Regions:
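Conserved glycine-rich cofactor-binding loop
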Residues: 14-15
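Short C-terminal tail/terminal secondary-structure segment
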Residues: 141, 220, 231-245
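Short, small/polar-rich loop/turn modules that mediate ligand/substrate recognition or access, typified
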Residues: 168, 173, 230-232
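Active-site helix of classical SDR
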Residues: 118, 152
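Conserved glycine-rich Rossmann-like NAD(P)H-binding loop of the short-chain dehydrogenase/reductase
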Residues: 30-46
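A conserved structural motif in NAD(P)-dependent oxidoreductases
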Residues: 204-215
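Substrate-binding pocket helix/loop in short-chain dehydrogenase/reductase
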Residues: 94-95, 99-107, 196, 200
Length: 245
């Protein structure tokens, strides 16, 4: 797969899964890699340095992906060969302990932002380009204290399906990747982090937990011409974990 030296955008692209995606797309030929991030300037600079070493030009955009200003700044660095919405946030609480502001914050960044990115970036994207959203198993399975994030990921997958149909006449593919349990800093927000990792390690049929590079490989596939007829789908990358009752 080659991105023909085009620019790509990865939100939440400076750490964990996002950084792995950015580096993978750079290895596939992306000339400029725009990285969105909310905080941790040191991690952003480290990711930028790794991209330079890989031969790509990094562009760092700091801010909340749910912000119209940030989305407009992302669009200004296009046109893109691929837009990957990996950024995610949320409040990890039981349903009855959540507040309306938690809902607005989580849904805005995780789901609405993909629609905002499509409105801002898709008009300038060429046929053969891709939009990819990164989801999680919580979109279809009930995870402890995950009501807000799980609902937002279900919404993201729905947005993916609608965009896939509406953008098909432009030749733009839209899909999602749903990652299993991945040991990144994002898991630090879960009070049952160690239990989740232990369960994933012992119950995953593939014999190991998912790594960021596994997710990046799936995203790269969806951004490639090989995925020409894959539209509006959510590709599950979990080593078979979700197949078990």
């Amino acid at each position: 797969m080659s991105l023909d030296s085009r620019a790509v955008l990865v939100t939440g692209g400076t750490r964990g899964i996002g950084k792995a995606i950015a580096l993978r797309l750079a290895s596939e030929g992306a000339k400029r890699v725009v990285l969105g991030f909310l905080r941790n300037d040191a991690a952003a600079e480290e990711a930028a340095e790794e991209l330079r070493a890989a031969g790509a030009e990094p562009v760092l955009v700091r801010g909340n992906v749910a912000s119209g200003r940030v989305v407009a700044e992302f669009a200004s660095h296009g046109p893109y060969g691929a837009v990957v919405h990996n950024a995610a946030t949320g409040v990890i609480r039981a349903a009855l302990e959540t507040e309306d502001k938690h809902w607005d914050w989580t849904l805005g960044a995780n789901a609405r932002a993909l629609l905002s990115l499509a409105r801002a970036c898709a008009p300038d994207m060429k046929a053969g380009s891709s939009l990819v959203g990164v989801s999680s198993l919580g979109s279809t399975r009930v995870l402890e204290n995950y009501v807000l994030v799980g609902t937002s990921k279900a919404a993201l997958e729905s947005v993916v399906r609608y965009l896939a149909v509406e953008l098909a006449p432009r030749g733009i593919r839209v899909n999602a990747v749903s990652a299993g349990v991945v040991e990144t800093e994002a898991l630090d927000h879960f009070p049952n982090r160690e239990q989740m990792l232990k369960a994933a390690r012992t119950r995953t049929p593939a014999g190991r937990i998912v790594e960021p590079d596994d997710v990046a490989a799936a995203v790269a596939y969806l951004c490639s011409p090989d995925a020409e007829m894959v539209r509006g789908q959510t590709l599950i990358v979990d080593g078979g974990y979700s197949l078990l009752a």
